[in-house]
């Protein structure tokens, strides 16, 4: 798949979601909002963008999960954050 440049906001969401669920199972959007201390509408908008990028799948009732590409990208972001600290 084509390599894309991710905004810092997208990186923050992917890293947090990967930390919350390193297995790539399911995460509730309300939990993401609480973890990042942002509003639910903000989470919804970002999850839509990440879904459009093919990095996660949105299901009913606020359930999302990272695609294999999303999970791999999240792990790379976390590794780069750890390397830079």
Give names to the regions the model predicted:
Residues 82-85:
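Amphipathic alpha-helical dimerization/coiled-coil segments
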Residues 51-59:
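A short, conserved structural fragment
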Residues 47-48:
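Short, hydrophobic-biased segments on the C-terminal half of alpha helices
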Residues 1-15, 79:
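Short alpha-helical segments that sit at the start of domains
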Residues 62-78:
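Basic, amphipathic "hinge/linker" alpha-helix immediately C-terminal to the N-terminal HTH DNA-binding motif
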Residues 41-44:
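Key DNA-contact positions within bacterial/archaeal DNA-binding proteins
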């Amino acid at each position: 798949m084509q390599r894309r440049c991710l905004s810092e906001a997208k990186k923050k969401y992917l890293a947090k979601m990967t930390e919350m669920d390193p297995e790539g199972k399911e995460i509730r959007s309300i939990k993401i909002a609480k973890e990042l201390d942002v509003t639910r509408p903000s989470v919804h908008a970002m999850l839509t963008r990440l879904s459009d990028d093919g990095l996660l799948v949105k299901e009913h009732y606020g359930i999302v999960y990272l695609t294999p590409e999303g999970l791999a990208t999240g792990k790379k972001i976390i590794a780069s954050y750890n390397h830079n600290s």
